[in-house]
Amino acid sequence: MLKPERMVRVSVVGPREKLGETADLLHRLNLVHIEEPEESEYFRIGEPHPDASVVSRALVQMRSFISHLKLDPSRIVPRRKFRESEIEAQLKEKLDEYQQLIGERIEYLRSVDEKIASLQEQLNQIEPLKRLGIPARLLKGYKTLRVFVGFVKENPTEKFAQVTSDFEVFATEYEKELVVAVFVKAEYGDEFLRILQECGYREIQVPDVEDFEAKISEIEKEIESLKSRKEQVEKEIEEVKVKEAETLLAIEEYLSSQMDKYELPLRTLVSKYSFVLVGYLPAKALNEFKAKMDANGVAVEVLDEEGEPPTKLSNPAGVRNFELLTTTFGIPKYKEIDPTVFIAIFFPIFFGMMLGDIGYGLLVTVISLYLKRVFKTEGWQRMLNIGVYAGVMSIIFGFIYGECFGPFIVPGEYEPYQIHFIGSQLEHLYEFHHGHPIFDRVEEMGVKILLFATIVIGIAKILFGFALGFYNVYVEHGLKDAILEKLSWIIGVLGLAMIIFGFAYNVGVFYQLGMGPNPGDVPPLPLPGLMEGWQAGLNVYYLAALPLLVVWFILFVMGEVPKMGAMGVILAVELLTWFGQIMSYARLLAIGLSSVYIAFVINFIGMKLIDPVGISIPIVGAIVLLIGHVGNLILGILDPGLQSLRLHYVEFFTKFFEGGGRLYEPFGRIKRFIEE
């Protein structure tokens, strides 16, 4: 779970005449991640199966049909699986049938669309001319006159007048543009054309039409007729889709599988008599794989690793959903720790801490469960499962905080029923806790405690990240590099933590938690003699920070100076970055409080509008509550989700996770519509 699944590198060697059978078996087993081959003196990359081009054309044809029909395999649950022999027997017949039922109709629809576009273009030419009110026969056919008809961005009349007064301009507006017809003696034609071009002239070709009105009516009727026929053909295609969807997808899956197998020689080295391919497979499947290959007359040999093996993530079902978030950031290298389990634990907790509302959490859960029924692809299913986990954690934290569409207890002289539309019911729910939340994050003490808790979480998470980084570097480069690169920062962050705890000790956080003395009895500086009263007690946290920071600096210099020289010492300021990242965890409090106060304001305004004692506008109040909480819910999903991701990607992953691996992609496919 913490490491990708162990892989072994194998070679598969056999007689060349068995390559086809081996391709079938490899595809069926769906185990071997095949490596790209490198040619040698005696082995060359093979050639695809002779039928590959035929299958390729058929596959392109089927995918074209499926694309046009907008068939989504992930959203179709097959009523039965088709046997491969059944598909093979009727393949030619079905391809011809679908070409007639779908292909020819698609071509017809394309021709109809082209005709409609052509007719629409004619309309676009004729309608502006109709607006001018000049018959087509008067707009062309002159020997001594030049006629210009088209669109312009500005009226050119004044510019024409500077050339000659012997011209006529007819102009009118059409769809926010100016349409003009210009008549001028031929001798001024070139000059007028230049002026028109300066005015943004776009010519309109004048068609041979006697009556614009009649022609427009004729074209519109023809367009309507074509659209009607198009709708009829689309209905016919839809009927084929409903009836043949599963068969279409089964044939596409069969052809895709055949294409994979026919192209396997391109990933295989062949000689005159034999073939060899190299790849990786899970170590636990090696014995079974060898047995099946031996039975097929093909040898399997385990090879030494070369380069980086592919990564096959190995996580339990619940954790597997969060692989989506891990691989979005990067794919773990083969020998790296897989951080998926940590993001599976902490992402929902952080989301719940920030949103922390029973009502919002319930909506997130219900919406995610509903969308799982709509979006069936693996990616959507995983993301929506994460939404369910996050929603459940929000409900749990919401119960702890005592919030359901906002708080029902706030500082001030307000009764729950005055500030919340179900305030009385919530107060009754918490009778076991004297009508108050288990933990109130709105009141002053709750804010201080939660702020301190988030900083402690930040310290622990960053230290844990560096500990994982220590392991990764130790595995890759050895103990010395791990100590200089990661242990040094663990010690440095511990020093920072002592300073933060010392400050909290001084300002009385521990005192308020019942874990320390009154801050008035604690000197702000750790060294005796610097101020009166030091004998009352020393701040042990500051004292502990000093040796930790000294040890950190020594290890840091030992690690950086050999690599970068004296300039490497300057990088010690990076310790302040870790301080900023520790404080960044305070967003677990800040984001949540912003959502709480927005919900409080929405409820307060809504209840004031509904309250019969004041200005009673119940409908407006209900609208305020509805729109306000919908908007706050959207913010409550986006902000905690993004901020929780950021705390993992930036503050946590960067301490140990390099990424850059490549996913395990075995040769073969999981078949949903066909079976052997």
Curated annotation (Swiss-Prot):
The keyword Electron transport does not apply. Pfam families: V_ATPase_I. Keywords: Cell membrane, Hydrogen ion transport, Ion transport, Membrane, Transmembrane, Transmembrane helix, Transport. The chain crosses the membrane at residues 341-361, 390-410, 449-469, 490-510, 538-558, 564-584, 590-610, 617-637. One of its GO terms (cellular component) is vacuolar proton-transporting V-type ATPase complex. InterPro entries: V-ATPase_116kDa_su (IPR002490). It is a multi-pass membrane protein. Has multiple subunits with at least A(3), B(3), C, D, E, F, H, I and proteolipid K(x). Component of the A-type ATP synthase that produces ATP from ADP in the presence of a proton gradient across the membrane. Belongs to the V-ATPase 116 kDa subunit family. NCBIfam families: PRK05771.2-4. This is A-type ATP synthase subunit I. It comes from Archaeoglobus fulgidus (strain ATCC 49558 / DSM 4304 / JCM 9628 / NBRC 100126 / VC-16). The gene is atpI.
